[in-house]
């Protein structure tokens, strides 16, 4: 959950200082919805760059320990809702990102992949050469999770002898 990355400076959602308790023109749940993204991409990208992109964020002890457990053969997979990529930065190889990642982007029209820097550090609404909007590869509210990622997550959970749940208010 988001709580795993707060030590790295990534905001969570529900704590006192979390995104849901900050003041915006729209509630974060609205800003992070598919319909809002389609209707107000400029507003979405302002929020994205101001709140979701945290430059200089580094993996913390939790990320590093999970990667170490994986290297030792004691951890089969990391299943995360986080979109920050810090598990991979810590060295975890088998990371199932249920909500996607801000480090992957693609054109909504032609599907062409784009480097995240174009979205995360650009200005305005990023567009592809084909004219389509480039979006981060994250799951917005009103969108379904990736069936393949969910199936893999269910497989690892079913096969697990021990399940570590951290950083979430479940």
Give the positions of each predicted feature.
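Conserved catalytic core of sirtuin-type NAD+-dependent deacylases
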Residues: 2-170
């Amino acid at each position: 959950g988001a709580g795993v990355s707060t030590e790295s400076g990534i905001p969570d959602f529900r704590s006192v200082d979390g995104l849901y308790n900050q003041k915006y023109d729209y509630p974060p749940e609205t800003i992070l919805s598919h319909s809002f993204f389609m209707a107000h991409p400029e507003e979405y990208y302002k929020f994205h760059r101001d709140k979701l992109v945290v430059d200089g964020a580094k993996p913390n002890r939790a990320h590093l320990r999970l990667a170490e457990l994986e290297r030792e053969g004691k951890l089969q997979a990391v299943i995360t809702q986080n979109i920050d990529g810090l598990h991979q930065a810590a060295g975890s190889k088998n990371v199932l990102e249920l909500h996607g990642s801000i480090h992957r982007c693609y054109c909504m029209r032609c599907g062409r992949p784009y480097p995240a820097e174009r979205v995360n550090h650009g200005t305005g609404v990023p567009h592809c050469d084909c004219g389509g909007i480039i979006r981060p590869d994250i799951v917005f509210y009103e969108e379904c999770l990736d069936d393949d990622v969910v199936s893999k997550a269910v497989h690892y959970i079913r096969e697990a002898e021990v399940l570590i749940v951290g950083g979430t208010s479940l």
